[in-house]
Swiss-Prot record:
Source organism of the structure: Myxococcus xanthus (strain DK1622)
One Pfam entry name: Ribosomal_L21p
InterPro entries according to UniProt: bL21-like, bL21-like_sf, Ribosomal_bL21
Protein known as: Large ribosomal subunit protein bL21
Gene Ontology CC annotations of this record: cytoplasm; ribonucleoprotein complex; ribosome
Molecular function as annotated in GO: rRNA binding; structural constituent of ribosome
Quaternary assembly: Part of the 50S ribosomal subunit. Contacts protein L20.
NCBIfam families assigned to the protein according to its UniProt record, in alphabetical order: L21
Lineage of producing organism: Bacteria, Pseudomonadati, Myxococcota, Myxococcia, Myxococcales
Length: 102
């Protein structure tokens, strides 16, 4: 069984046992997380498509890590000889999907 969830303004296709990196959400490592914004639930039978979400469906996962992505660097060089270097590390949450109900 698989589902398409929406979290952090993005959509993810997940199945039971998958480990996904999503935009940072609140929760300690080891905590259980429930996603209720389910756009599609599929499996052996015909898929259930929500308009906009599937009623009564939910995906439960376990938080594995709260971390940051690799640094993204931005360089800027002007004609006069000065440079500027900026960096950014986007925080994320790593979640293991434990169950899909729908």
């Amino acid at each position: 069984m698989y589902a398409v969830i929406r979290t952090g303004g993005k959509q993810y296709r997940v199945a039971e046992g998958d480990v996904v990196r999503i935009e940072k959400i609140a929760g300690d490592v080891g905590a259980e997380v429930t996603f209720t914004e389910i756009l599609l639930v599929g499996g052996s039978e015909s898929p259930k498509v929500g308009q906009p979400t599937v009623a009564g469906a939910k995906v439960v996962g376990k938080v594995l890590a709260q971390d940051k992505h690799r640094r993204v660097l931005h360089f800027r060089k002007e004609k006069e000889g000065w440079t500027r270097r900026r960096g950014h590390r986007q925080p994320y949450t790593e979640v293991k999907v434990t169950s899909i109900a729908g």
